[in-house]
Each structure stands twice: as C-alpha cells, then as structure tokens.
From Swiss-Prot:
It comes from Influenza A virus (strain A/Fort Monmouth/1/1947 H1N1). Pfam families: Flu_PB1 (PF00602). This is RNA-directed RNA polymerase catalytic subunit. A motif (Nuclear localization signal) lies at residues 187-195, 203-216. One of its GO terms (cellular component) is host cell cytoplasm. RNA-dependent RNA polymerase which is responsible for replication and transcription of virus RNA segments. The transcription of viral mRNAs occurs by a unique mechanism called cap-snatching. 5' methylated caps of cellular mRNAs are cleaved after 10-13 nucleotides by PA. In turn, these short capped RNAs are used as primers by PB1 for transcription of viral mRNAs. During virus replication, PB1 initiates RNA synthesis and copy vRNA into complementary RNA (cRNA) which in turn serves as a template for the production of more vRNAs.
Length: 757
C-alpha cells in the first residue's frame, strides 16, 4: 500500500506533526562496555566549569576539593558554577515573601514524614551501590547488607525500624575508628569430574571478614557508583549517571520530601505532578500572562535549555537554601536535612569497571581496573583518553575520583526546581520595577520563560536580566539552544503548547506492544495502554481500533497462540487445535489458548477472563482458575497490579492494570547459570529475606498496607501475634486444647532460642 506521506499532514497543524520527528520508534540505543570514560568526562567537565574556585583538602579522606561558591563573577557566556550565596539567600527570601508561610508549612509536613517513615522506604529503587561488596546490588539486598554490618559493629538504633534511627546509625558509623565487613569472594580449584573423568574448574563462594579503617570507610560511604545511562534516544553520545549508597539515600529522601512539599505549593513548578494535572497547572501560568498582555503589551516565550544543569549546581548552595528554609525549626530537624548536601560536597565518584584492552595479534584481552589508572603508563592509551586520565589523576583515591562541585544526575530534582522557580518568582512587576515583567515554568533543568513588555527592547532587556540573574545562582541558560517565539507556541518537558497543550503521542509509542511478563499480564497491560492513550493522548477511535488489532496480532505471534482454526503451524498449534476441537463454547477460550478476540474499544476496561467468563465451558473454567493446578507456580495476585512502563523520557511510570489470577499468570523460573557464580551467596541471602517477608505476611495479612509499628523485632511481633490468634481460636472452639498447648510451647521455645542467641 503506497501512501504519499505528505498527504497525511495536509490538515494537521505543524505542532501535531512535530511529534512524528521524535526518535521514539524502534529500539533505543544501549551502551556496551564500561562507563569509565563517560564518568571521567563528567568529573573533568565539572571541575572545568568551577576551575577558578578555591582548592582545599578534606582532612578525613585526604581528597582534594574544589569550591567555586562566591567565586569570580563570569565575564563571558561560558557555563560556570560560581553561585553567589547572598544572591541565593535573597532569592529564597523573595520566594517566601510572595508565598507567606511556604517554608514553615512544608517543614511541619516534612517533620511528620521524618517521624513516620520506615526504613523499608529505602528498599524501593533499582540498582544501588552496595558499599560492603563495592558494587551494585538490588536496593533491598544492599540495605539488608548495610544493616547486617551495622549490627555486627554494635550499631543497633535501626532495630526500631524507623528510617530516622537507621540514619542515626549512619552518623555514628562515620565516627568509628574501624568497621568490620563481610565480603564474598570466589575460590577456583581444578578437580576431576567423577563421571566424565575430565578436569573441571569448580567454583566455591567464600565469605571473609575484612576491617576498614575510618578513612576507607568514609570513602566508601561517600561513594557514588557510576554507570552509563541506557536507552537514551536522540543523543549521539552516551553519558554517565550515578547511584548512591545506602548511607546517602535516606538523607536525600528527607531533603527531597521537603522540596517536593514546597514544589506542590509553587504554581510555576512542573514537579511533582505529571500528566494532565501538570498540563492544567502550566496552562494556567500561560493563560495569566496572555490575559494580562492584551492591549498595550507584547508577550514572548522562550523554550529554554540550560547547559549542564547538574554539573554547575553545587551542594554547598543547597546547604545554604536548606539552612534558610529551616531557620526557625528544631535543631535535630535542621541537622538531619543538612547532612545530604554536606555528604554531596565531599562525594567521591567511582570510575566503574575500567578499560578493556585487546591485542589483535596475540588474541589477548585484559581489563585495566579503575584502581590502576592512577599509576599505569599512559603510552597504551589513545590521545583523548590520555588527556582525560592526566586531568583526573590529581583527584584519584583508590579508584574513585574526588568530586566536590556539581550534583550527579537526578539526585535533587525537587530542590533544584525550587532554585529555578525562585528566579522566575523575581520576574513580578513589583520586583523588576520597570516596564517589563516575566513568569515561567520550571521542571528540574527544563524551563519556559514568558516575558511581557511594551516593545521589543523591553523583551530583550527582560531576557538579559533573567540570563544574568541565572548566572548568579549557578544556572547557565544556553543562548544557542534556547528559542524565542510569540507566546502561544512553545515546548516544555516535551509537551508542545499551541493555545493549549498538544498530545505528543509519539512519546507513548515505546509502551505499545507485548511486555513479556506472562500471557495474563501482557494482555491486560496491552489493552490498558490503548485505553489510557484514548483518555490522555488524543488517540482517536479508528486509530485505537487499529492499534488493538495490531496488538492482538503481535500477542499471538509472541505466544504462538493463533486461533484454533488457523492454518499457521507453530510449536503450540498442535495442543491449541486439540483444545479447540474439544471445546464446546469456542467463544469462551482466551486468546492465549487459541480463542478469538472479543475486545473492542468499548470494553477495554474489562479483564479478558471476566469478558469471557459466561461463555466458557465448565471444565475449561475449572482448569483456568484453579489455584491448586500443579503446573503453575503462582504469585499471590492483588486485584490491581503495577507494571513499570518506560515512557520515552523521564522516570519509569507505574501503570496500574487489572489482574485476574489464572493459570496464565505464571512466573518464569530463575536461570541456573547464576547459581555457579559469585552472585550465589547474594541470591541465598535474597531468598532468605524473601522467605522471612512471606512468613511475616502470613502472620500479618494486612501488612501489605499497614506495617506493625513499635520497637519489637519481626520475630517478637510474630510470636505475640501467634499467641493472640491461638487464644482467640481456642476460645471460639476452632482449635482443640492439644493444638493450643502445642502452639504455646513452640512460641516459648522460639523465645528461649532468641535469649540464648
């Protein structure tokens, strides 16, 4: 079918067509190899932007540190990180003046959160730098390892289960002269296989104790591990992102809680809301500027871009902001919030895996770990790498680079938004005291600036003043990449505004298709994505119907479940045909069992099992929804599940979909190969962790939404719960006296064992 593509756009306004130029179809680019080079780039760039600052040495770790704060004012347009403390504090004061009580109220809200947050908050999140093993781990495992090490070193405040008490342990750990940790290592030995009589390498996992002195421990506690950001579209070069360890995470969480609470009260902030709510909020600001500029004024909007936002931000500036925002608050609260920026001022960047060398002639490959970069001969490297290493060498300690200025990606999104909004806030007429005034939108490093003035000269003056104000706070608006236009057409966080926000549908493209979880979840997610896009993103009925047909086709190819009467031969077609022939009511078969598709755009909100329930054969229904079916390892399914959708940019979104537990909701088994690697010890820890949690959930069925509060340990809580339940069951006659006595005896034994331990 040949279509002339230009015909498609005859009636479409340019703003709608622009979404087709976004690089969101096909697979995104992934990075291979190490991120060491990208990390060195980040460290070197960050120091270059602040190069005229003051050098000092950290007395504890010996790391050289560069402090650009209150440094020389810029004389050119080059990006720079010389924020001026007094300017930042003044911007904060004006922000408070135009929003009376904003900091006070947010502090009160945050204090409540601090008192109530449980330590399991830190198990959220993906890969985390695990300082005990010096590499990345799933967040829950990294937290468990940290707590285990803390307890074996006599730090036990965390046993209360409150995050704030865990953070007290972190503070104490930094004062200790040494910390003892358990590390995993691999032993390899050659043994003869009994069956094949060949020599094979046998790997065993050992655990050994290791002592870290204060300096080594501090370096690890302040380390951010770096990786390459994957799946970034529309970029030629990759870049590094950081993952902090458990010591830093809790403190960052509380700072961001305060900043989030402030952002919610600021009309110019694009965070923390999203989706339609965000569009409505932003449209309000634009409407205000347009209605006020009707007759005498002209109005222009800048689609803004900042140069290297995080690399010019400075943790010391954030410390000044926090000190100001919490100035009338209790001492303990101010201390808790000031620790994150202090740790970031002393942060170390781990350089990753190092470099891989291969010799074509000798067919050899060898890895040069990051720790060796400090003293290896540079003749092996090409020019650009050699320059990088020479530049970074003075900053290296044990394979990590001292990185005092700059913030790594994504750490303080909310707080940096507050900083950006404080500049926009200065644009009101009462502050500019001239004929022009301005407003705008800020979302992390992305901004849109709206300037109103009687004439073009006024607009230019307004933009210039904004540009210079930004420089004073360490923000660098890029003159090359920012674009000015009559108000009414601009772009902000990939939303295109044209007298109202257009749907940028192309950004949703990656989430269409088959997710690959299991047959049940995939069907549910697929139709939910189509439904959501009809609601939120202008997906019209005809296109939605087509999307649905394509999805069903894709689904059938993925799971090889073509209709029972099809001619297509696949690995499953034999079984599916057999089922088709012996089924009386063929309309009741699920698509994944070779049934036909009953979905259309009107019933996308109904799970497939419910849609076909009345049409199913009795015995098919019984097999499909049989919890005792031995061929299926079930997960316990809540009525609503969450899928993690990766939108085209921005953080992964949680998408809810209806889940009906059937024999199609299977979980694939773990790959065997992991069991022979050094990961095995970790896997065993993880399984034990999982078992404990499952057991706990059995005792407290409601614990999925309410954690038992109090100082007791998990075991104590379960024992006391068992006693209460047993007594109730005994008194109501549900269990016999013998059973009751036995339960009580087991409880006493458990307590006795705990005492002996």
């Amino acid at each position: 079918m040949d279509v002339n593509p230009t015909l498609l756009f005859l009636k479409v306004p340019a703003q709608n067509a622009i979404s087709t130029t976004f690089p969101y179809t096909g697979d995104p680019p992934y990075s291979h190899g190490t991120g060491t080079g990208y990390t060195m780039d980040t460290v070197n760039r960050t120091h270059q932007y602040s190069e005229r600052g003051r050098w000092t040495t950290n007395t504890e770790t010996g790391a050289p540190q560069l402090n650009p704060i209150d440094g020389p004012l810029p004389e050119d347009n080059e990006p720079s990180g010389y924020a001026q403390t007094d300017c930042v504090l003044e911007a904060m004061a004006f922000l408070e003046e135009s929003h009376p009580g904003i900091f006070e109220n947010s502090c009160i809200e945050t204090m409540e959160v601090v008192q109530q947050t449980r330590v399991d908050k830190l198990t959220q999140g993906r890969q985390t730098y695990d300082w005990t093993l010096n590499r990345n781990q799933p967040a829950a495992t990294a937290l468990a390892n940290t707590i285990e090490v803390f307890r074996s070193n006599g730090l036990t405040a965390n046993e209360s289960g409150r995050l704030i008490d865990f953070l007290k342990d972190v503070m104490k750990s930094m004062d200790k002269e040494e910390m003892e940790i358990t590390t995993h290592f691999q032993r390899k030995r050659r043994v003869r296989d009994n069956v094949t009589k060949k020599m094979v390498t046998q790997r065993t996992i050992g655990k050994r104790k290791q002592r870290l002195n204060k300096r080594s421990y501090l370096i690890r506690a302040l380390t951010l591990n770096t990786m390459t950001k994957d799946a970034e579209r529309g970029k030629l070069k990759r870049r590094a992102i950081a993952t902090p360890g458990m010591q830093i995470r809790g403190f960052v969480y509380f700072v961001e809680t305060l900043a989030r609470s402030i952002c919610e009260k600021l009309e110019q902030s694009g965070l923390p809301v999203g989706g339609n709510e965000k569009k409505a909020k932003l449209a309000n600001v634009v409407r205000k500027m347009m209605t006020n500029s009707q007759d005498t004024e002209i109005s222009f909007t800048i689609t803004g871009d900042n140069t290297k936002w995080n690399e010019n931000q400075n943790p010391r500036m954030f410390l000044a902001m926090i000190t100001y925002m919490t100035r009338n608050q209790p001492e303990w609260f101010r201390n808790v919030l000031s620790i994150a920026p202090i740790m970031f001022s002393n942060k170390m960047a781990r350089l990753g895996k190092g470099y891989m060398f291969e010799s074509k002639s000798m067919k050899l490959r060898t890895q040069i770990p990051a720790e060796m970069l400090a003293n290896i001969d540079l003749k092996y490297f090409n020019d650009s790498t050699r320059k990088k290493i020479e530049k970074i060498r003075p900053l290296l300690i044990d394979g990590t680079a001292s990185l005092s200025p700059g913030m790594m990606m994504g750490m303080f999104n909310m707080l940096s938004t507050v900083l950006g909004v404080s500049i926009l806030n200065l644009g009101q007429k009462r502050y500019t005291k001239t004929t022009y005034w301005r407003d705008g939108l800020q979302s992390s490093d992305d901004f849109a600036l709206i300037v109103n003035a009687p004439n073009h000269e006024g607009i230019q003056a307004g933009v210039d003043r904004f540009y210079r104000t930004c420089k004073l706070l360490g923000i660098n608006m890029s003159k090359k990449k920012s674009y000015i236009n009559r108000t009414g057409t601009f772009e902000f966080t990939s939303f295109f505004y044209r007298y109202g926000f257009e749907a940028n549908f192309s950004m949703e493209l990656p989430s269409f298709g088959v997710s690959g979880i299991n047959e049940s979840a995939d069907m549910s997610i697929g139709v939910t994505v189509i439904k959501n896009n009809m609601i939120n993103n202008d997906l019209g009925p005809a296109t939605a119907q087509m999307a649905l047909q394509l999805f069903i086709k894709d689904y059938r190819y993925t799971y090889r479940c073509h209709r029972g009467d099809t001619q297509i031969q696949t690995r499953r077609s034999f079984e599916i045909k057999k089922l088709w022939e012996q089924t009386r009511s063929k309309a009741g078969l699920l698509v994944s069992d070779g049934g036909s598709n009953l979905y259309n755009i009107r019933n996308l909100h109904i799970p497939e099992v419910c849609l076909k329930w009345e049409l199913m054969d009795e015995d098919y229904r019984g097999r499909l929804c049989n919890p005792l079916n031995p061929f299926v390892s079930h997960k316990e399914i809540e009525s609503v599940n969450n899928a993690v959708m990766m939108p085209a940019h921005g953080p992964a979104k949680n998408m809810e979909y209806d889940a009906v537990a059937t024999t199609h909701s299977w979980i694939p088994k773990r790959n065997r190969t992991i069991l022979n690697t050094s990961q095995r010890g970790i896997l065993e820890d993880e399984q034990m962790y999982q078992r404990c949690c499952n057991l706990f959930e059995k005792f407290f069925p409601s614990s999925s939404y309410r954690r038992p509060v109090g100082i007791s340990s998990m075991v104590e809580a379960m024992v006391s719960r068992a006693r209460i339940d047993a007594r109730i069951d005994f008194e109501s006659g549900r269990i016999k006296k013998e059973e009751f006595t036995e339960i009580m005896k087991i409880c006493s034994t458990i307590e006795e064992l705990r005492r002996q331990k």
